[in-house]
Amino acid sequence: MDIYENNTNDVWCRDHGPIFIKHNETGKVAITDWEFNAWGGKFPPWDLDNAIPEKAAAALKMERFTSKMILEGGAIETNGKGTLLTTEAVLLNPNRHGGKPGNKAEVEKELKAMLGVKDIVWFKKGIEGDDT
């Protein structure tokens, strides 16, 4: 096992770390790198957290796909077969979209392009008190 050490602002690497994807036909693994703003700007600073996916891709010598969309890893769940679950309360929240409500069609388009999912199941909200 290899251990990679990096400074972070917060311990929740599930939310700010890389999301790994695997090509169904080639088996090639890559990293997706989303913007991170510490759960809608609640816990500044987040600059070190936001840098982790890029550092991981470099350390692991993996291809990295970047997105300008703000996303925490804990805000989505996939089954690896094309379906993704998420909540409107998080992914469409104005604190992830520059103060304006997110556009569901645009968010879906980006999730599908970056993660290769086909179906997205939206819930209105998640568990009370869970920021992701």
Locations of regions flagged by a protein language model:
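The feature marks the mature, well-folded catalytic cores of soluble enzymes
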Residues: 1-132
